[in-house]
Every structure is written in C-alpha cells, then in structure tokens.
Amino acid sequence: MKYIYIINGRADKAAKYEDFYKQLKENPHPYEVYTTMGEGDATRYVRLYCDLHPEEEVCFVACGGNGIINGVASGLVGYMNSGDPVASECDNKTIAILYFGGATQDFIINFPGRNFTSVKEMLAGAVTPIDVIQVNDSYCLNVCNVGFNSTVASRANELVAKGKSAHEAYTRGVINAILTSRFNRIKITADGERIARGPMVLCTVANGRRVGGEFNCAPNAKLDDGLMDVCYFRAMSLLRLLLLIPLYRSGEHIGSRPGKNRVLYRQAREVVISSKDLIDLYLDGEQLPGSRFHLKILPGALPLRLPKLETE
C-alpha cells in the first residue's frame, strides 16, 4: 500500500512539519507528500487521484486539523458516492489522520487512547468504517451547527485570522453570540417531524461529540451507529443561557435543570434545516451559506485507518 500525506500549503504551517518529515525518515514505507494549493484543493486532489488510479491501493493521510481532515474525507466519500460503478465498489482506498499541534482537534477527540501524532502508530493501525453526514453536496465527519454556534465560529475565525489564540478567539466569539444570536428563526425537521416552533438559540446535528474546540454538544453521539444526534436550544432568557453555557461545554446540558423545556435532544437519520433568510451552516468548522440544507447519514461510508490503541 502507498500512503499519500496531504499537508496544508499555507506558509505559516511549515514549521509544524519538521517532526513529521523526521518521522517519515524513521519509518520507511512507500509514500508521497502532497502540499495543497488553496481552499478545496485537498478534496479535488483526492477525487482526481481516485479517478485516475482506481486499481491502486492507497491511504490518504490528512495532516492537520478539522479543515484538512474534512477536505480529504470529502474527496474520498465524494468519489465512492459518485454513482460510478467502479467507484461504488471501491475497497482499496482509505484515509488516516496525523494531528499537528495548534490545529483544531474536535474530530480525533472521538477516539481516546490513540496517538494521532505518530506515523509509526498510524502504520500499525487498522481500518474501521465510520458514518458520514451528507449535507446537500458536501460532507461532514463531525458536527454541523447553525445559530449560536455558527456565530461563535464566524467571529472566532475572524479573530484567529488576526493572530488571536484559538481559546481567546472562541471565548470572544461566545460573548458576541450571547449578545447577538439568541433569537434565530430557523426551521428544523428531523425524520420529517418539526422539532419545535418559534425562535431558537442553536441547533447542532452531530456525528461526533465535540464542536468549536470546547463544546461537548452531543455527549451520546457515536460515529458508527447510523444516526445523527440533534441538539436544539429553544430561545431563552439571557440568565438561563449563561447558566447553560458551562453545561454545554462539559456535555451536561441534556436533562439539566437550566435546560428543562429549553434543550431538546433526539436522534435522526435525516434532518432539514431551512430559513427564509440566508444563513450560515458550519460543518466541521467550515462555512456553508444557504437557506435550505438537507442532511442525511451515510452509514459506514468512510474507511478510516485508526492508530493502534496505546494499550495494544
């Protein structure tokens, strides 16, 4: 098998790859390194490579955080889900993940006891199929969100681009969202049933458990159960929201006293999010503008190579 390591081409990421190249030398194996050339390039590259080399056994290794993981996975799932007979029978392509410090790591939190920084542990690992959420023509591995969370993400991304730390950016993003995003008029249906009427604070549709670097939005979510976990906050007073935010961080918001009659949690296979206005849906931290989003779960759609468990 050949491994193709896909790394972010941004100049400010270069210093983080020194240890990566050292590990490649210490663990000889067939590999190539591809450096992305811009937004969406990881997805395009993986899709094109699969089209041109359908018979080749390859593991595409996403090197970084949520964004590049989503890009690489979207390329492979998009290829396998394209309707092409050869692609739909594809069983010789997988993805793996190498995490570099500083990148957002919401997705790999779902796999405790595994070292995502080690090439050696990745090579010794095994493949397991995980679910993927399809969102219109895009794909999500971890969490989709609208309302409060998307306001936090939007503001945080602006601040990170200006050089603020991820923690400071998200803290300030939360403050901004508290002041501006408590009464969103967005309609959510799950498996054909409207979740609630009236304004809402937020809604997350989750495959994994954590979003935004610190919010444990879906503590019961599993990546291989064929279901999405939907968490919905009705509009509420500022005081109640302030009481809920710490619980939302820790994953204790479901069934909590401040969340009574305000926090709704259920599972679904299909979800529709719609609004009369243009809104931003964030999937794996990436912005997707629109007014209607159709989400459905694709059970076992992504073959993911996980690092060897540290206890093995």
Residue ranges of model-derived segments:
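Structural motif
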Residues: 2, 138-139, 185-187, 202, ...
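A residue-level signal for conserved active-site and pocket-lining positions in enzyme catalytic cores
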Residues: 66, 133, 152, 203, ...
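Short, glycine/serine-rich, charged loops/turns that create anion-binding
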Residues: 10-11, 102, 207-210, 235
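Small-residue-rich beta-alpha loop regions that form the catalytic core of phosphotransfer
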Residues: 2-164
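ATP/pyrophosphate-binding catalytic subdomain of soluble kinases
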Residues: 135-227
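ATP/nucleoside-binding phosphotransfer catalytic cores, i.e., glycine-rich phosphate-binding loops
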Residues: 190-192, 197, 222, 232-312
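Generic preference for hydrophobic
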Residues: 5, 33, 188, 230-232
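Short solvent-exposed loop/turn micro-motifs enriched in small/polar/acidic residues
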Residues: 54-55, 124-127, 179-181, 196, ...
